[in-house]
């Protein structure tokens, strides 16, 4: 119960702050405040600390109420915490009343999102093209479609060190080709959060960017801060379930592709065991695992999926683990890794002698996604696309029906298996086949779906269970390797339940 959790968090916080003013509506908020202010969880606040924060609280309260905040279902503490994620306490304290009002105006969409129990709205397909009529010419609206755009891509790494960055760069070059003369793109590399990420996003905007894509979840903080400083710029971050209405987030429904590769794996397995490599227990990953297992069971009813995670400490090479168990069909990472064999990704077969044979792999058509978004901006549909969100943050989570997600099939697949995969691809793309529209039993024996209906996108994105065909578990925060914990703090399925001492900064 969130209310009970909030009560215990307040009881933990009060002895160090000794103030009743600060209240929040979201679990984890006290810990976030302490982290942002540089305080350890049990560190006693000095009288000066308390005076400083109370002064900020009253300063923000006055501006919040002047904006009509009294009618909203969020607290002054919620708004103060939001502001402190974007500005330092010194910056806030030095603002004039009019400047603070302007800052709050720029963040108002995010303030409205604070009162939502589910602050993220999932968009499952591209917006419909704008219909232009005679009145659009006689009485043009205030949101005029631009004739030319500058689009910037800010990457955490480079194409030579990251296949992920390379895929997004292919998408960027597609924009140059499709919108030649209308769109100009630029790329910025090696954006490190907490170091130069904010500066690189700012540089992109200084260089004239109208639209900025940041292609790593770790860049969401830099994206949010830039969006507040530059509300006229459209900023999108490649991540899931980020509750910030000032920016938009985007990802793909990988589980649809995993369902198809699972069916292929089941058909190609010589026995009843298949290996599966997962990276982080983040939003959407359990859905990927379950969809793969359900696809595999469709072609191999007695199959078991052996699940191995790469985010655990002292993790042995999963390929070695699987081969020691006699498992020869494996779903590996979704993209090639530097310094790894080029075929050790996607779903593959281990031949005698250790030779790897490609079977199939999920494939991202990022260019199609970027083309759809830029076309929406060019035709004036960006604001219209946002109008139905009811103050919530927008997360684009597009699937195979949008053309953004696909499955690459190996030419070495048997013809009958290729034919099956093509049927499944057509069915998933058309909506005739839903991977989760079936009876599903969890590992604990509970019925997760009766089979009379599918699961909605919110249920799929927040899935935190595994079906009964999977051997393995979803690791919790304490089990992860230290290097894996920052990503979990941002995208982990149980990130909001992290104890106080494990809270992270944005």
Predicted regions and their residues:
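Segments of small-molecule ligand-sensing domains
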Residues: 21, 37-130, 380-506
């Amino acid at each position: 119960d969130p209310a009970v959790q909030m009560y215990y968090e307040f009881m933990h916080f009060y002895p160090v702050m000794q103030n009743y003013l600060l209240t929040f509506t979201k679990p984890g908020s006290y810990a976030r405040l302490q982290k942002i202010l540089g305080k350890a969880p049990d560190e006693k606040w000095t009288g000066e600390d308390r005076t400083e924060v109370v002064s900020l609280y009253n300063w923000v309260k006055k501006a919040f109420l002047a904006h009509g905040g009294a009618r909203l279902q969020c607290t002054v503490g919620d708004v103060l915490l939001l502001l402190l994620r974007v500005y330092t306490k010194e910056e806030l304290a030095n603002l004039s009343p009019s400047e603070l009002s302007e800052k709050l105006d720029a963040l108002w969409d995010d303030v409205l999102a604070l009162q939502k129990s589910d602050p993220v709205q999932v968009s499952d397909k591209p917006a419909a093209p704008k219909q232009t009529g005679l009145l659009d010419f006689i009485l043009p609206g205030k949101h005029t479609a631009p004739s030319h755009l500058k689009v910037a891509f800010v990457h955490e790494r480079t194409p030579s060190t990251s296949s992920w960055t390379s895929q997004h760069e292919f998408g960027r070059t597609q924009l140059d080709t499709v919108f030649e003369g209308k769109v100009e793109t630029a790329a910025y590399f090696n954006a490190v959060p907490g170091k130069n990420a904010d500066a690189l996003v700012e540089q992109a905007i200084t260089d004239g960017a109208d639209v900025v894509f940041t292609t790593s979840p770790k860049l969401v903080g830099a994206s949010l801060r830039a969006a507040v400083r530059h509300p006229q710029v459209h900023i999108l971050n490649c991540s899931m379930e980020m509750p910030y209405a000032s920016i938009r987030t985007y990802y793909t429904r990988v589980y649809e592709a995993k369902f198809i590769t699972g069916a292929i794996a089941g058909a190609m397995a010589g026995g009843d065991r298949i290996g599966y490599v997962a990276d982080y227990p983040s939003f959407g990953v359990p859905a990927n695992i379950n969809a793969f297992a359900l696809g595999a069971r469709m072609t191999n009813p007695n199959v078991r999926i052996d699940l191995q995670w790469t985010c655990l400490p002292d993790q042995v090479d999963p390929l070695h683990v699987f081969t020691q168990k006699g498992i020869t069909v494996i779903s590996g990472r979704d993209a090639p890794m530097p310094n790894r064999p080029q075929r050790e990704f996607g779903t593959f077969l281990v031949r005698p002698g250790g030779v790897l044979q490609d079977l199939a792999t999920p494939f991202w058509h990022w260019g199609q996604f970027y083309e759809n978004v830029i076309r929406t901006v060019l035709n004036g549909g960006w604001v219209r696309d946002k109008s139905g969100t009811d103050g919530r943050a927008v997360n684009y989570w597009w699937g195979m029906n949008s053309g953004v997600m696909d499955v690459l099939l190996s030419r070495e697949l048997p013809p009958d298996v290729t034919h099956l995969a093509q049927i499944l691809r057509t069915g998933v793309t058309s909506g005739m086949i839903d991977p989760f529209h079936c009876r599903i039993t969890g590992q604990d024996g509970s019925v997760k779906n009766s089979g009379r209906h599918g699961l909605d996108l919110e249920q799929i994105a927040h899935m935190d269970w595994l079906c009964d065909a999977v051997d393995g578990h979803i690791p919790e925060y304490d089990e992860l390797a230290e290097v894996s914990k920052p990503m979990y703090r941002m995208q982990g399925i149980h990130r909001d339940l992290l104890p106080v001492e494990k809270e992270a900064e944005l």
